């Protein structure tokens, strides 16, 4: 192995957060600016040391959207991974070739005003919205798109469209 392929994957978790109406939360990355392409994503973040992935996803939700008013619906039982493009590897100091992720489906139990992007000192997101699960692959940066396509398939049962 040479170059980026010799680097390890960074372990992290992702949250597919569904409203009671079956929509999924997407948030706009604050560091890319409002006019950037593919600036919307699902909450995700690193696993600290030997932290349990289920605990990590709750911590990440608190850090990124200011709430843990959720219930676990399901998870993808295996690790999903993607490789960063070369410019992203370089941007992060060539420490990781990409990310390996555990994805969780969760139901939001609170009200929209409980989602607070400014709950912590350095917000990752500057805007959020509820959207259709089927729309998330088109919102994702191309290197994450296969993961979001998998989420749209595997978590479709949590995306009720009857307005309930």
Swiss-Prot record:
Task: Give the main EC class.
Answer: hydrolase
Mind listing the UniProt keywords for this protein, alphabetically?
Hydrolase
* Alphabetized CDD domains for the sequence: NUDIX_Ap4A_hydrolase_plant_like (cd03671)
Its GO biological process annotations read: nucleoside phosphate metabolic process; ribose phosphate metabolic process
Any single GO molecular-function term of the entry would be:
guanosine-3',5'-bis(diphosphate) 3'-diphosphatase activity
> What S-S linkages are listed for this chain?
none
Q: Mind telling me which Gene3D superfamilies this protein's record contains? A: Nucleoside Triphosphate Pyrophosphohydrolase
Pfam families reported for this sequence: NUDIX (PF00293)
PROSITE patterns attached to this UniProt entry:
NUDIX, NUDIX_BOX
**Carries keyword Hydrolase?**
yes
Q: Which residues form the Nudix hydrolase domain?
A: 8-153
Q: NCBIfam families, per this entry? A: PRK00714.1-3, PRK00714.1-5
Please explain the role this protein plays, according to its UniProt record: Accelerates the degradation of transcripts by removing pyrophosphate from the 5'-end of triphosphorylated RNA, leading to a more labile monophosphorylated state that can stimulate subsequent ribonuclease cleavage.
Family membership: Belongs to the Nudix hydrolase family. RppH subfamily.
PANTHER family on file: NUDIX HYDROLASE 26, CHLOROPLASTIC, UDP/ADP-SUGAR PYROPHOSPHATASE
What is the recorded name of this protein? RNA pyrophosphohydrolase
Taxonomic source organism: Acidiphilium cryptum (strain JF-5)
Give the taxonomic lineage as stored in the record: Bacteria, Pseudomonadati, Pseudomonadota, Alphaproteobacteria, Acetobacterales
């Amino acid at each position: 192995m040479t170059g980026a392929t010799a680097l390890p994957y960074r372990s992290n978790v992702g949250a597919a957060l569904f409203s009671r109406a079956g929509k999924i939360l997407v948030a706009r990355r604050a560091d890319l600016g409002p006019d950037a392409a593919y600036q919307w994503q699902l909450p995700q973040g690193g696993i600290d040391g030997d932290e349990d992935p289920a605990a990590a996803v709750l911590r990440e939700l608190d850090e990124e959207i200011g709430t843990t008013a959720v219930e676990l619906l399901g998870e993808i039982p295996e690790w999903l991974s993607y490789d960063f493009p070369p410019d992203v590897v370089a941007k992060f100091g060539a420490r990781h070739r990409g990310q390996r992720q555990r994805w969780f489906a969760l139901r939001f139990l609170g009200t929209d005003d409980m989602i607070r992007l400014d709950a912590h000192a350095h917000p990752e997101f500057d805007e959020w919205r509820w959207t259709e699960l089927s729309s998330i692959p088109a919102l994702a940066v191309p290197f994450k798109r296969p993961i979001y396509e998998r989420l749209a398939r595997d978590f479709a049962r949590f995306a009720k469209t009857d307005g309930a």
